[in-house]
Amino acid sequence: MSDTGTTTDGRVERGNQTRRLVLGRTMDIASVEGLDGLSLGRIATELRLSKSGVFALFGSKEELQLSTIRAAAAVFAENVVAPLKDAPPGARRVRALCRNWLTYSSERVFSGGCFFYAVSAEFDARTGPVHDAVARARHDWTEYVERSFAEARAAGDFDADLDVEQSAFEVIALMEAANAQSVLFGEMRAYERAERGITARLRASATDRGLAGLDAGDEAA
């Protein structure tokens, strides 16, 4: 029984390693070429794996695409959201969240910049499970930014009449514009412009308490 269990555990771990290897490659491909650039055969060839083995792990191109989206969401959360899990609500935290996003894009965690910006343009006018998964990831991020603004407002860092949905829309637009310009033209200045615009937007709606937090963040940086 113990030998059988050890053998099974070994196979499971090898399967998990192969899955991580495949998804690492598919995330990079999709960020540059789109999710339609993925296929079981291509991945098997590029990674020198058996096509039957890749098929056993994913079963179809659509499942490979969906798994890639889920993996990318985990990478995004690890780089952008997780570093702030212990940070108190406030204007300083909102700006740090935006800075994390700009760093995630500018440091090319994915080869094509922001994974979700790239695949959203590919699937925004389509229907089906892949479109729905992309839309859900985008919605979750927007909702998270809105909630961060709302929590900062409740903490007294922003004016009581702050429109959190509008504020989130504006800072996300600046971040995505920086990503698009940098990826297209291969330059980094767009990220500096985006950060200046975001900071100006936050300061325009910040209370004295919020301004103090933003100023303290500048000194810490």
Name each model-derived stretch.
Residues 1-33, 37-46, 63-66:
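Basic, helix-initiating cap at the start of DNA-binding domains
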Residues 1-7, 96-103, 139-155, 174, ...:
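C-terminal peripheral helix-coil segments that are non-catalytic and often amphipathic
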Residues 47-58:
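Short hydrophobic/aromatic patch on the recognition helix
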Residues 58, 63-72:
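Alpha-helical DNA-contacting segments of helix-turn-helix folds
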Residues 67, 81-112, 164-171:
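Hydrophobic alpha-helical connector segments
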Residues 92, 132-138, 154-170, 189, ...:
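All-alpha amphipathic helical-bundle segments outside canonical DNA-binding/catalytic cores
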Residues 93, 107-129:
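Amphipathic alpha-helical segments used for helix-helix packing
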Residues 112, 117, 160-181, 197-200:
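Hydrophobic alpha-helical segments that form the core
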